[in-house]
């Protein structure tokens, strides 16, 4: 009704009981999905529900990063963790892309069902105390992406391709709209890198270490922004 809220799902109830160790009468920070944040008083808490009396819910969520992340589809378990991490860091636009070294079987994973993706995004938002869900797009072909999506994505963004062996190091502290492209575990193949550079992207590297995708993405976002 705009003044009260109810939680009934087991995961969040367990979090209130075991992590917050909340008690009736506690004031907690809350957020409305897609909306603002603020404070609420916990008026009832039991095994089946939590009731809140909402106060002024008018605080904006944390600012988003000015980045559209294009990520070669990782293996399913890593996809789940990566979605949570990048959502917590403030990424609001994500494209999952097929490349030569992405196993085709990954596209059949239950982790790509809309409800599973939504679940991982929610976990990332909760971790960061954010309310704005990212947009996730699936692109199952590299050539169609290059021809139909990349030109528009680059019109108002600086394109950066993260790939070992590139000449330039990853820039630091940039504050401009950016398109960040990250390859799969084995990296982009040379032809893919050539196509991306020819389209106007800049190549860059994170140093001599070869990192797992989830580690590399976190490091890139932290360094860039």
Describe these PLM feature segments.
Residues 1-59:
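N-terminal positively charged helical leader segments and presequences
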Residues 3, 24-26, 36-38, 48-50, ...:
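A generic structural signal for short beta-strands and their flanking turns/coil linkers
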Residues 6-10, 64-68, 176-179, 198-206:
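Glycine/charged-rich beta-loop-alpha catalytic/anionic-binding loops adjacent to active sites
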Residues 16, 79-82, 192:
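Hydrophobic side chains in well-ordered alpha-helices
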Residues 60-158:
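RNA substrate-binding interface of SAM-dependent RNA methyltransferases
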Residues 152-193, 202-204:
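Active-site/ligand-binding-proximal alpha/beta "capping" segment
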Residues 190-225:
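Structured adenosyl-cofactor binding patch, chiefly the S-adenosyl-L-methionine
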């Amino acid at each position: 009704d705009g003044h009260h809220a109810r939680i009934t799902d087991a995961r969040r109830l367990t979090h209130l009981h075991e992590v917050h160790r909340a008690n009736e009468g506690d004031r907690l920070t809350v957020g409305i999905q897609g909306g603002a944040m603020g404070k609420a008083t916990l008026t009832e808490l039991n095994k089946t529900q939590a009731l809140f009396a909402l106060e002024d819910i008018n605080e904006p969520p944390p600012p988003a990063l000015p980045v559209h992340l294009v990520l070669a589809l990782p293996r399913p378990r890593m996809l789940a963790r990566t979605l949570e991490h990048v959502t917590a860091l403030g990424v609001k636009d994500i494209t999952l892309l097929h490349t030569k070294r992405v196993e085709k079987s990954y596209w059949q994973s239950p982790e790509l069902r809309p409800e599973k993706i939504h679940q991982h995004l929610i976990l990332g938002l909760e971790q960061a105390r954010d309310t704005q869900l990212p947009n996730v797009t699936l692109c199952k072909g590299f050539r169609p992406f290059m021809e139909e999506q990349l030109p528009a994505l680059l019109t108002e963004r600086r394109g950066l391709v993260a790939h070992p062996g590139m000449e330039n190091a990853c820039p630091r502290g940039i504050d401009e709209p950016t398109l960040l492209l990250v390859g799969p575990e084995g990296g982009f193949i040379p032809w893919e890198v050539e196509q991306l550079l020819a389209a106007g992207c800049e190549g860059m590297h994170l140093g001599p270490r070869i990192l797992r995708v989830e580690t590399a993405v976190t490091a890139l976002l932290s360094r860039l922004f």
